[in-house]
Structures are given as structure tokens and as C-alpha cells.
Amino acid sequence: TCSYCKIVGTIRLQKYLYGSDHQLGFKQISSCAHAIYVVRKTVEYYVSNDSTVNICTLDISKAFDKFNNHCLLLKLMKRRLPVNFVVLFQRWLCNVFIKVRWGSCLSKLFRLFSGVRQGGILSPVFFCIYIDDLINKISHLDTGCFIRGFFSAIWLYADDIVLLSATVSGLQHMINACVQELDYLDLSVNILKSRCMRVGRRFKSIGTRVVINGSPIDWCDELGYIGMIFKSSTVFM
């Protein structure tokens, strides 16, 4: 299996194995600093034009453990990946067997039907492809933040999602689309770890609830995103 990954990794498949520019994780030339930078610049652009930005971070429950291999294969086929590689990936992904050790006891061998391999050479690429339609769906809503026509309403760092909108209604629209698309992917949002916050002149004016399946997301004075803490204020802090 490892040999397969190394061989495939040397073949030029960028035409098929790519992710959105709005996914800043798993890339050699990007880091957490880039993710923070694009959020900061988007918020500062709107605040400088006397707007208030609504920020929402969504936490995906066990995103890597619930990774649906068959869904990934369908996405690869939609990209017209050559059939020999589809078959190769199908055999590689769907024939994973493990044992569990508990103390001195070892379980019987059993098959895994979901999950992406931690540390696998192609695992980051597969996850980017798997989540790519979520970004595409949000980008086609024509809502959220734009900077002179450039779409800047959703950014991901691996499985960490941040949504940016100048209106609460626009934010809710994007959240609904995210929840729907994640449901298609056999994933769900952990509402207890998801947060909303406002930055701008009217940061204290919160009149509308933001919900996921009827349950409200908390509006907070502070919001954590990939190791950084943002504060609700008149300016981005």
C-alpha cells in the first residue's frame, strides 16, 4: 500500500488530484499564518468601509474518522480520473484491515469502511478533494464577503471552516448550505464547538439568532480559530 502511494505520488495527476484555493491546509506554500491573514484582510476591508462583519467558525465532528471512501471514489470519477487509477484507489481504500490492542489482548482482524489514513502520503490530497464541493457550493451562493469582486466568504484550513458575511442573513444562508453539503458527505457540524462573532462599528448589535437545524450557535466575545483568538470589537484583534 505504501509503495502504491509513493508510485502514484511521482505520477503527474495534478489535473485530477487538486483542491480549491480556499483550502489553505495541506499545501507546501501555505500555513496557519496565511489562513489568519486572509480572514484579517477581509474583515479589515469591510470595517474600513464602515461595515460590520459576521464571523462563524464551524467544527466538523470527526471529519477524518468519518471520511467516506465510496464518496471519494465518486468524486474522482466525476473528475474523469483514468479508470486504472480509480480501481487502484478503490482497492487501496476499501481493503483496510486492522486489529485493536487492549493491554495484552489483541482483537480479531476486521475491516475499516471509513476514515482517512493518518500520515498517509495521499491522505491530505484525498481530504481536499472530498471537501472541495463544500467550497464550490458556498461560492455559487453569491453571498458573504467579497473584496472588489474576489470571493472571500469561506476559508478552510484542513477541516477548520470560517465563514465571513456582512449580513446575518447571508451568514445563515451559508451555514445552511454547509450543513446540507456536509450531510451529503456523511459529516456533521458540532454545534457545541461552533461559534459566531461580530467585528466592526456595530459589533454589539446582535438581533438575529444563527441556527443549525433549529439549535442556536452562540455569539461570543472571543472566537478561536486554528490556535488564534479573535476578539469582538470595532476592529480586528
What positions do the PLM features span?
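Short, flexible turn/loop "capping" segments at secondary-structure junctions
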Residues: 48-50, 153-156, 221-222
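Short, conserved micro-motifs composed of acidic
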Residues: 189-221
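Conserved pre-catalytic core of RNA-dependent polymerases
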Residues: 1-129
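Basic, alpha-helical interaction scaffolds
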Residues: 4, 214-237
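Active-site palm subdomain of RNA-directed nucleic acid polymerases
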Residues: 9-23, 126-158, 162-164
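Catalytic palm subdomain of template-directed nucleic-acid polymerases
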Residues: 62-79, 154-185, 199-202, 231-237
